[in-house]
C-alpha cells in the first residue's frame, strides 16, 4: 500500500479524535490505546503504544496526525518523557511526507542531553522553536515527565515547558527564512507530527490534546521585531548552530526580569542574567548569592555570577557558587605593586599612571593570575584599559600572547564585549589560533544599552569564527569550579 493510500486509510478508520472532545473545546489526539489517527512515515515500526503511552524506539520516523488535521490557530498540550540522549520534537503547521525530516512548519524541540552525531554538536534544547528562537539551557531532566504547551495565534507562537515560558515569537511579514533552513518554515496551517529522530533517541508521549482557536485570534500586544541586517544575521546564526547567547546581561537601570525576557524573545538572543558579587557589590555573601539564584527560578535563562575584585573567591563557598550556571570575571579590578587597589574604569582610582610600561606589565601579570587561579568560565571585558590609553599600541603581541595563552591553557572562554568593543581583532584572531572559545556579552547598564551581539557578529565575519568556536555551559569539560573549586571558601 502506498504512503498516500495508507494515509487515506488511517484517516478514514481512525478519524475518531473528535469523539474525545470535551465541553471546553479540547480534543484528545491520542486515545491511549492505539495509533488510530496517526501515520508513521519511513520506519513504521519505530512507533508503538504500550501501557497507555505513545513511544518511539527505532530508526528515524515521523508520526503525522491524520485526523481533522488542518490547524491554523490552536492551543496544544502534551506530556513528554525523554530518555537520555534523546532528540525528538513536535512539529506543527506541517504535512505528511514519505521520508526525511519535515520540510514544512515548525518544530518544538525535545532535547535535554542529546549531543549530536559525528562532529555536529546540537546546542538547541527542549522548548526551542527550532532554529528560530532557541533555548540553550537544559530546563528538565531526562527520565522525567514534563508538560509542553504550544499556543499559536496569528503570527505569534508561545511555548511553555512545565510553567516556564521559553518562546514568545512574532513572525515578521514576510517571514525571514535564512539560507539552509527549510523553505516552508513560516506560520500557515497544517497538521502535527512527533519526531523519532534516530535509533538512539527514545521518547514517550501521553495526554496529547488540542483545541482550535478562531482564525482571527491574535496574541495581545504581539509585535514583530524590526527586520534589519542584525535580525537576519541572528536568525541565520541560530539556524547554523551558533549559540546566540548574551551571557553578560544585568538587571540594572530599571531593567527587570519581565523586561529582559521580552527583549530576549523579541531580539532572538538567549540571555545569561548575571549579578555582581564581591567586595563592595550588591551581593557579598552566600545568603545573597542563593537568594539571587532562587529569584530566577522559573525563568528560561542562564544564571550568571560576575565575580568582582580579587577577594571574591574567599567570600563565597563552593556550594553557593555551584548554584550558578557559570562564573565570569575581568581584569578591571586589581592591586598594583605598591598595594593600591583600583578599578580601571574609574579614573579617580587609577590616577596618573607614571610608568605606562610597568602598568601594562602588572596588568598582564594580574590577568594571567586571574585566568590561571580563579575558578572562572569566561574572561569578560577582556584586556580592558583605562580611558585614554592606546589599546593597539600597548597590547603588544607578547602581552596578548601571555593573556590569551593563559585563557587557552585554563579553558576560559573570551567574551566578545559589545559595550567596550573588546577584545580587538588581533586578540580575537590569536585566541582562535590558540583554540579558545568565545561568548557574546553586552555588559549593559540598563535596557537602553542591552545589545544584540553586534560586536560579536562583526568578529565572526572578520575573523571567520564558526559555531564550534563558541562556548556554552557544560559543553567543554564542565564548570570551572569543578576544576578549581579549591580556590573557594569552604
Summary of predicted features, one role per range:
Residues 1-16:
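N-terminal secretory signal peptides and thylakoid transit peptides that target proteins
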Residues 22-227:
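Carbohydrate-interacting regions of secretory-pathway proteins
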Residues 95, 213, 332, 384-387, ...:
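Flexible loop residues that form catalytic
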Residues 107-110, 272-273, 415:
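Structural recognition of the beta-strand scaffold that forms the well-ordered cores
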Residues 119-120, 282-283, 336-340, 448-452:
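Short, charged, surface-exposed secondary-structure boundary motifs
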Residues 226-311, 378, 382, 386-398, ...:
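An N-terminally biased module of ancient metal coordination in phosphate/nucleic-acid-related enzymes
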Residues 226-241, 391-490:
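Charged catalytic cores and adjacent phosphate/nucleic-acid-binding surfaces used
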Residues 285-409, 461, 465, 485-489:
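Extended substrate/RNA-proximal surfaces in nucleic-acid metabolism proteins
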Amino acid at each position: 500500500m502506498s504512503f498516500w493510500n495508507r494515509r487515506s486509510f488511517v484517516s478514514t478508520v481512525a478519524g475518531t479524535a473528535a469523539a474525545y472532545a470535551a465541553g471546553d473545546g479540547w480534543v484528545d489526539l491520542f486515545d491511549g490505546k492505539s495509533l488510530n489517527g496517526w501515520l508513521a512515515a519511513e520506519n513504521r515500526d519505530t512507533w508503538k503504544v504500550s501501557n497507555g503511552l505513545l513511544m518511539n524506539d527505532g530508526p528515524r520516523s515521523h508520526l503525522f496526525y491524520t485526523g481533522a488535521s488542518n490547524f491554523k490557530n490552536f492551543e496544544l498540550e502534551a506530556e513528554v518523557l525523554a530518555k537520555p540522549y534523546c532528540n525528538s520534537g513536535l512539529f506543527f503547521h506541517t504535512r505528511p511526507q514519505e521520508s526525511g525530516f519535515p520540510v514544512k512548519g515548525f518544530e518544538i524541540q525535545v532535547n535535554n542531553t542529546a549531543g549530536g552525531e559525528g562532529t555536529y554538536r546540537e546546542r538547541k534544547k527542549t522548548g526551542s522553536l527550532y532554529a528560530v528562537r532557541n533555548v540553550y539551557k537544559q530546563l528538565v531532566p531526562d527520565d522525567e515527565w514534563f508538560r509542553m504547551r504550544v499556543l499559536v495565534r496569528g503570527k505569534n507562537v508561545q511555548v511553555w515547558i512545565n510553567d516556564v515560558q521559553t518562546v514568545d515569537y512574532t513572525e515578521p511579514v514576510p517571514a525571514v527564512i535564512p539560507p539552509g533552513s527549510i523553505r516552508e518554515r513560516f506560520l500557515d496551517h497544517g497538521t502535527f507530527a512527533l519526531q523519532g529522530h534516530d535509533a538512539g533517541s527514545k521518547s514517550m508521549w501521553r495526554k496529547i490534546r488540542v483545541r482550535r482557536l478562531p482564525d482571527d485570534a491574535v496574541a495581545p500586544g504581539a509585535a514583530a521585531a524590526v527586520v534589519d541586517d542584525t535580525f537576519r544575521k541572528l536568525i541565520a546564526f541560530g539556524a547554523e548552530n551558533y549559540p546566540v547567547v548574551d551571557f553578560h546581561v544585568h538587571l540594572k537601570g530599571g531593567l527587570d526580569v519581565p523586561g529582559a525576557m521580552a527583549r530576549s524573545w523579541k531580539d532572538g538572543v538567549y540571555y545569561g542574567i548575571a549579578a555582581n558579587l564581591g567586595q563592595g557589590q550588591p551581593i557579598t555573601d552566600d545568603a545573597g548569592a542563593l537568594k539571587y539564584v532562587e529569584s530566577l527560578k522559573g525563568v528560561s535563562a542562564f544564571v550568571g555570577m560576575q565575580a568582582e575584585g580579587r577577594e571574591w573567591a574567599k567570600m563565597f563557598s563552593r556550594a553557593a557558587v555551584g548554584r550558578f550556571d557559570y562564573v565570569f570575571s575581568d581584569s578591571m579590578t586589581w592591586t598594583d605593586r605598591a598595594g593600591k587597589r583600583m578599578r580601571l574604569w574609574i579614573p579617580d582610582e587609577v590616577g596618573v599612571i607614571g610608568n605606562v610600561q610597568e602598568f601594562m606589565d602588572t596588568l598582564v601579570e594580574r590577568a594571567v593570575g586571574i585566568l590561571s587561579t580563579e575558578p572562572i568560565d569566561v574572561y569578560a571585558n577582556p584586556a580592558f584599559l583605562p580611558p585614554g590609553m592606546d589599546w593597539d599600541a600597548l597590547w603588544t603581541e607578547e602581552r596578548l600572547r601571555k593573556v590569551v595563552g593563559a585563557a587557552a591553557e585554563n579553558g576560559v572562554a573570551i567574551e566578545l564585549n559589545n559595550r567596550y568593543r573588546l577584545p580587538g581583532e588581533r586578540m580575537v584572531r590569536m585566541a582562535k589560533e590558540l583554540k579558545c572559545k568565545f561568548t557574546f556579552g553586552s555588559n549593559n547598564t540598563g535596557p537602553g544599552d542591552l545589545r544584540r551581539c553586534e560586536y560579536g557578529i562583526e568578529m565572526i565575519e572578520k575573523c571567520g569564527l564558526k559555531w564550534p568556536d563558541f562556548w556554552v555551559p557544560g559543553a567543554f569539560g564542565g564548570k570551572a569550579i569543578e576544576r578549581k573549586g579549591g580556590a573557594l571558601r569552604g
